Amino acid sequence: MKRISIISPAYNEEDNVEACYQAVADLFAPGAPLEHYEREHIFADNASEDSTATILRRLAESDPCVKVILNARNFGPFRSNFNALRYATGDAVVVFLPADLQDPPEVIPEMVKHWENGIEVVAGLRANREETLMLRTFRRIFYRLSNSLSNFEIPENVGEFQLIDRKVWEVVISHTDHYPYIRGIIASTGFKRLILPYTWKARKRGISKNNALALIDQALNGIFSFTTVPLRLCSFLGFIIAFFAFLYAVFTIIMTLFDASAAPAGIQTMITAIFFFAGVQLAFIGLLGEYVTAIHAQ
């Protein structure tokens, strides 16, 4: 019997973890779409401050299909989820099913169906999002910027709610990033992928733990994890600034030869030196970044 592993991160989700557990268990019950598959449900608690950990312990004691990872502190959503991913033993793995059930578990049987037909990555796409206009706009800007800078495409509104084959899982967990951007890692593997649209639901219980600063942090991590364009742009701008500073120095010398009183003594030299050395510093910062990137890639 094939096994399906499902990863559910949680942080202060005492109102949702039991509902998440039951929703997944119902998919594998007799007569349900996944009755012929073995279930492995891994909860990763990110040092919750409420009774989430207590509830998860009780679920694990009563159901051998449930595994629980209790983090010693809050490591953030990406690191916590990636750590839990390492413990998956299934033939296919649902990378991210958050306990708040905004990503609907009822989509998983269709994901499994496509996987059985040879698709190695079934990526859920949030075709409809029950969220504010500001958040939608922010996400749209992020995806367009990220895709314009990276060497591969992450479809807009595709998150970590994806089902991946075991061989994709092996490639993904081989990454040793300190702060892994999971959807980017999966997209970079290049395996056969299918996009599956679904409606991302509004949260029914509790409040979201993702504030504006957390979203910005995740966006910056996504942008800088898979592209060297900002570093090269830094070098390019540095050389450009230094070049124009040099031209200005030549222009200043020529003007001084014709009219020594064109500006107070030393002003042109100071302006030229400031811009020239600022440009040189910026260029070498970019070059240093290129070397660090090369070391990281090795």
Label every model-predicted segment.
Residues 32, 39-42, 53-82, 86-87:
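Conserved donor nucleotide-binding strand/loop of the catalytic core
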Residues 45-54, 101-102:
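A conserved acidic beta->alpha catalytic loop
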